[in-house]
From Swiss-Prot:
Residues with lipidation of kind S-diacylglycerol cysteine: 29
Cellular localisation: Cell outer membrane
Function: Plays a critical role in the incorporation of lipoproteins in the outer membrane after they are released by the LolA protein.
Membrane topology: Lipid-anchor
Gene: lolB
Disulfide bonds: none
UniProt protein name: Outer-membrane lipoprotein LolB
Family that this chain belongs to: Belongs to the LolB family.
Leader sequence segment: 1-28
Gene Ontology biological process terms in this record: lipoprotein localization to outer membrane; protein transport
Subunit-level organization: Monomer.
Annotated coiled-coil segments of the chain: none
Primary site of residence: membrane
Amino acid sequence: MAAAGSLCQTAWRVRGWLAAGLCALLAGCASVPDAPSGTAEGAFSRGGRFAITMTESSGEQQAVQGGFTWRDDGRRYQLDLTNPLGSTEARVEGRPGHATLTKADGTVLQADTPDALVEEALGSPVPVSGLRDWLRGRVADDAPAGKLQSDAQGRPLSFEQDGWQARLSRYDDQGPGLLVLQRTEPGRRIVVRLAVSQP
């Protein structure tokens, strides 16, 4: 059992920047709009499991999985990623004009915008937005969406937006319980899977 725990921890250390990259990527999707001070509009929290796979054109593949908890009061947000043992591996905290990513080893990345944080963490620009809406079962209105398919209640099931192909399913009152996001970039393909288990 101890050996298995050590193996998991080692794998997470090896893949730490991939996890941090996912954290920054999700934060980049969660740009917080300027809102009047004290407003609770848009407040929500979601949690569950995540898995991210990055496949290089050479066929080399990196993958990491764990848990996520997202707390958002409409102006500030906090996103935690945990390893399979439940330890926090990365945390992103953000507000308009500032975003910070802190890894478990104390490494800190800071940027004016979540998108800049994504570029610093992943090493390439990923101008994404919308996950904040997607987690609620909405297509973001700040970018055009293509190939939109909806269910009988008008909730989006699949669409393309900001370079991502998104599939949403297993809806509850708060939004989709499963999000599968795929993005193809020069030299690599990224697949992110979020399974929500907490409202």
